[in-house]
Amino acid sequence: MAGSLPHHSLRELARRHGPIMRLQLGEILTIVISSADMVKEILGKNELAFAQRPEIAAVEVMSYENSSFVYSPYGEYWKEMRKICMLELLSMKRVLSFRSIREEECWNMIKTIQSSQGKPANLSKIVLNLINDVTSRAAFGEKCKYRDEFLSFLEEVTLLAGGFELPDLFPSIWFLRYLSRMKPALERLHKKIDVILDHIVAEHEEKLKGNRGNNEEKNAREDLVDVLLNLQKSSETNYFIKPHVIKNIVMELFCAGSDTSSTTTVWAFSEMVRNPRVMEKAQAEVRAVLKGKTQVREQDIQGLEYLKLVVKETLRMHSPGPLMARESREACTINGYEIPKKTKIVINTYAVGRDPEFWSDPESFVPERFLNSSVDFRGSSFEYIPFGGGRRICPGINFGIANIELPLAQLLYHFDWSLADGVKAQDLDMSETFGITSRRKTPLIMVAEPCVPFSYDGDHDK
């Protein structure tokens, strides 16, 4: 399955062999889960037994001294990092503090699209740059001067950290990491990123020295690196927050924040283009709720109920991570099957989100299916787990959703859209690639026609 679309291949196997399968993938005993009932066994009844992630070769190379928060073993270090992320870095209060950044960067995106003057625009790239700029300003306090280097790093990691490369399937054969060119390539890229992160952290340390005693200024301008440096000075957390840990957390937040939000936003727009009825309904709602305003503000999003359904349906059909990996911390029994300790568990979220047992007409994009539904993406609905579940559920849900909804509202409000080169909606290529996330295989090329007059009053601090 390496090099193909493993989530598709595994779904086809599950159709023939059932929702729980035992596979021998190279040296790795793997249990594949493809239904909500089986997900409940893993992320519900036996969640603590599966609170571990398996080792991935690419992550070993890119993390600092095995300090990855996302992939670290379940234990005291992971618990402390999780608490820091939930309470300090990605809390709702912190996410709301970045509201002006999202609004300003969305406005920059609108100006970029307007400047295309009716020519075809690469919406995939425009959205990726937008989310990259939002994430870098939230993390570093300013747009990243090293955007190209970070995006190159993000591209490589996304492709290689899916867990289906040869070094992951045959971990005892160490030289495969070199034959596959994975390790040398990532090491070179990581060295470049390390120099950049050292520079960013050093700049923030100097800035914090200059702001000592000025708490009002500090709180107004505090970004995620500032938060981590302040935590480093705390007696309660300094044991965990070492310099290399700060760099690793920033790198992982940057990669996760940029990739998942941009991928989901582009898929949402692609599905609306492919389904004109949905596009028209979402666009009509945005324009009715805003009633001729010249700018979409984040507080306006609360009234866009149909847009929220579009995002939910996108996450069902295009889960940010199509395959979710866990590892058994102890021997246990699942649905009558004995699962040995250190068995790799792969939950096919792609298959679960399209399971006809739980979803009517699962291959069709129908946002209305979530009307008056209690199904939610925060981990309690096992048929719908785009952000995972249990202790390992994604801590950045609030940050991610905020970075998806506002750009979509802006794009729908200010422009009417058509595909380039006369391509019809039903002919839009919806092929995907495989990696940590599942992106479009080809960029989404669109032609924008300005519709609603827009202006920006510049009332936010830069």
Name what the model sees in each region.
Residues 145, 276-278, 397-437:
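Cytochrome P450 heme-binding "Cys pocket" and the immediately downstream C-terminal segment
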Residues 32-42, 48-51, 138-150, 258-284, ...:
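Classical protein tyrosine phosphatase
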Residues 1-97, 101, 122, 127-134, ...:
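Cytochrome P450 substrate-recognition site 1
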Residues 1-18, 195, 276, 297-337, ...:
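Conserved cytochrome P450 K-helix E-x-x-R motif and the immediately C-terminal K′/meander segment
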Residues 251, 373-404, 429-433:
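Cytochrome P450 heme-thiolate "Cys pocket" and heme-binding signature region
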Residues 436-462:
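C-terminal helix/juxtamembrane-tail motif
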Residues 54-62, 96-265, 281, 298-299:
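Cytochrome P450 heme-thiolate monooxygenase catalytic core
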Residues 301, 325, 347-375:
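Conserved cytochrome P450 K-helix/beta-meander segment immediately N-terminal to the heme-binding cysteine loop
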